[in-house]
């Protein structure tokens, strides 16, 4: 039942949530709010919108177009809020002058794969980098076999799948690889869009999930909530700094965020590859953010919606693999919302 509901949500967020028009629609009137951006947060956004409309009677429409497009939309003033899983770059900050970044959800980027007969596998950062560099090309590669001594690994070519659109999942994934692999950091780097050395591009989380599902031997980085819905895919346990292989589940995501003791003025913080003391942390965990103008035209409605998302709206997260925000993050978010 839960999986069917999630699949329905993911079909909806392939385009829009709440019946929204295209991103070019003018900013919301007094009738409600419009937003655009992250596909990672979109399943949770569906529940936020439904709950908020019931509680406050204020409609919210959201376009799940990817973090990069969401930042463009809020910078142009065509929506009331953007949503991104990546901090804005200096260039984006200049284009979105006066915009405020507010952390409002916590999840992870998982690795889903399609290998017949295999549902779980251990992968390390260097091996993942090797796959996306195009240097590890078969599932029976000795480097994969060493991490999975009991697994029956087939002679099957690996097809890495990546996001073709500007994506916060790409940011989290490549940020993690840049911390693990000096070669990745120098040759590819991390951003919402990078020049991958191997693989096939697909648009959105739904596109990556679909491409992996229909391609034997494929592997792709996918938001954790989409991995829940795509029950047919195998899921990788990724090695963390403590040397443990962990899955992108609530407990492990929450442990990754437990290392955050304060937030900088930007309200953004990376929790990929967290310190060794977080022994059970999933190492590609990430915060996701609302991006709003400091002088919002819909200030009152926007503050209500944002406060709802970071407090009462958090209860919807568990079923979708979103962990609750740490208290220190909620406090920083409330201060940022009050400053609008």
Stretches found by the model and what they are:
Residues 22, 27-340:
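Flexible loop/hinge segments at secondary-structure junctions
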Residues 1-32:
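Short, low-complexity disordered leader/linker segments with a strong preference
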């Amino acid at each position: 039942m839960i999986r069917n509901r999630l699949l329905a949500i993911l079909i909806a967020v392939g385009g829009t949530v709440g019946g929204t028009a295209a991103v070019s629609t003018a900013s919301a009137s007094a009738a409600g709010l419009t937003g655009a951006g992250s596909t990672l947060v979109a399943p949770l956004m569906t529940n936020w919108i439904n709950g908020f409309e019931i509680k406050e009677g204020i409609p919210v429409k959201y376009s799940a177009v990817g973090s990069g497009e969401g930042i463009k939309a809020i910078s142009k003033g065509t929506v009331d809020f953007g949503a991104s899983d990546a901090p804005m770059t200096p260039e984006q900050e200049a284009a979105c002058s006066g915009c405020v970044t507010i952390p409002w959800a916590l999840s992870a980027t998982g690795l889903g794969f399609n290998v017949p007969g295999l549902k779980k596998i251990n992968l390390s950062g260097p091996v993942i980098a090797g796959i996306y560099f195009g240097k590890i090309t078969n599932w029976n590669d000795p480097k994969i076999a060493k991490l999975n001594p009991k697994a029956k690994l087939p002679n099957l070519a690996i097809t890495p799948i990546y996001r073709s659109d500007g994506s916060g999942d790409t940011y989290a994934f490549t940020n993690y690889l840049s911390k693990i692999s000096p070669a990745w950091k120098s040759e590819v780097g991390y951003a919402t869009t990078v020049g991958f050395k191997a693989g096939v591009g697909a648009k959105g989380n739904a596109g990556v999930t679909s491409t992996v599902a229909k391609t034997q031997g494929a592997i792709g980085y996918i938001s954790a909530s989409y991995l829940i819905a795509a029950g047919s895919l195998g899921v990788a346990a990724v090695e963390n700094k403590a040397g443990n292989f962990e899955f992108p589940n609530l407990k492990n995501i929450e442990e990754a965020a437990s290392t955050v003791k304060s937030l900088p003025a930007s309200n953004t913080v990376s929790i990929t590859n967290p310190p060794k003391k977080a022994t059970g942390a999933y190492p590609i965990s990430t915060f996701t953010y609302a991006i709003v103008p400091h002088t919002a035209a819909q200030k009152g409605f926007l503050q209500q919606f944002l406060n709802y998302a970071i407090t009462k709206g958090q209860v919807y997260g568990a079923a979708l693999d979103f962990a609750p925000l740490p208290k220190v993050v909620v406090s920083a978010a409330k201060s940022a919302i009050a400053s609008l």
